[in-house]
């Protein structure tokens, strides 16, 4: 293992020690709780939307979340290992066949919806 990979692994372990980052991907609806600093106070703000892509890897990995706010599309890019992220929660899993869902930017209304992925284990267990 070379020196750069070793340093990155140490930083990755240190940053992810207190966090529980769930497995999620494009098409999943997530709630990202972000720490917002206002003056001398900090508060947690929830940002809910569809993950339209992940990029990078290791410490540099980030993901883009898109939501519709008052009829206007808003996208925000979050670094996965950011100390400003309090928690990430997956609300529902989406069934998509693309790694990047940039085509959602051009869709409106019902056509912009993503079909929910059916869990095969739950269907077998019933």
Curated annotation (Swiss-Prot):
Keyword Transcription regulation attached: no
Gene Ontology process terms (BP): translation
Gene3D superfamilies the UniProt entry points to: 2.30.30.790
Keyword field: Ribonucleoprotein, Ribosomal protein
One GO CC term, this protein: cytosolic large ribosomal subunit
Coiled coil: none
Gene Ontology molecular-function annotations: structural constituent of ribosome
NCBIfam families per UniProt: rplS_bact
Family the UniProt entry places it in: Belongs to the bacterial ribosomal protein bL19 family.
Task performed by this protein: This protein is located at the 30S-50S ribosomal subunit interface and may play a role in the structure and function of the aminoacyl-tRNA binding site.
UniProt xrefs under PANTHER family: LARGE RIBOSOMAL SUBUNIT PROTEIN BL19M (PTHR15680:SF9), RIBOSOMAL PROTEIN L19 (PTHR15680)
Protein's recorded name: Large ribosomal subunit protein bL19
Annotated source species: Bradyrhizobium diazoefficiens (strain JCM 10833 / BCRC 13528 / IAM 13628 / NBRC 14792 / USDA 110)
Organism taxonomic ancestry: Bacteria, Pseudomonadati, Pseudomonadota, Alphaproteobacteria, Hyphomicrobiales
Gene name for this UniProt entry: rplS
